[in-house]
Amino acid sequence: MMRKLAACLFAASTVLCVTRAHAVNTIKQPGLHPAYTFEAEPHLLLGFDLPGKGADKHGSGFGPGFRGTIELVDNGFVPSINNTVGIGFGLDWLSPGDRNVFWVPVVMQWNFWLSDRWSAFGEPGAGFYFGKASGFAPAFYAGGRYHFSDAVALTLRLGYPNFAIGASFFL
């Protein structure tokens, strides 16, 4: 009985160690990520510090949006790791109070493919608001994705001037 238990524990720990080692080493294997040229990301977002805070004092808003990223470099700035670089653009509709504000960001997206299930990214850039309020603002984001498959991922983006959660489709 003890021999069977020991064999099962050994087999389970071997499988877990091999799986964990694969996940750890993926970042060190350039090019080991889904093959795509465009990432389409519909999302919901919470914006804050919106321009045009009038008498209604609404500085935040909630709404739907879309981000599209075109992959520019398959093996990004650091050739020894699994990274890509793209240009991202979007359109977000925020409705703070009784007014509508649209946010149009343009960012550089630097992706780090950590494992077959996880990736992270940073996005510096800028954008402009228009609608009942208008203005120009810097944009800084950091985010992560949980990949259900090579084609679909759950995406979380945190930064300034908004937070977003959505689904990424790698086309």
Regions found by a protein language model. Name each.
Residues 89-117:
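Helix-adjacent hinge/juxtasegments
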Residues 24-37, 73-85, 98, 113-119, ...:
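Short loop/turn motifs that connect adjacent beta-strands in outer-membrane beta-barrel proteins
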Residues 42-46, 64-70, 91, 106-110, ...:
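Residues on the lipid-exposed face of transmembrane beta-strands in outer-membrane beta-barrel proteins
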Residues 48-54, 74-76, 93-99, 114, ...:
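Gram-negative outer-membrane beta-barrel proteins
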Residues 36-38, 58-64, 98-104, 118, ...:
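Residues that define the transmembrane beta-barrel architecture of outer-membrane proteins
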Residues 21-74, 93, 160-161, 168-171:
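Short glycine/proline- and aromatic-enriched beta-strand/turn motifs that initiate or cap beta-hairpins
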Residues 1-33:
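Cleavable N-terminal export/targeting peptides
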Residues 38-42, 83-89, 104, 120-124, ...:
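Transmembrane beta-strands of outer-membrane beta-barrel proteins
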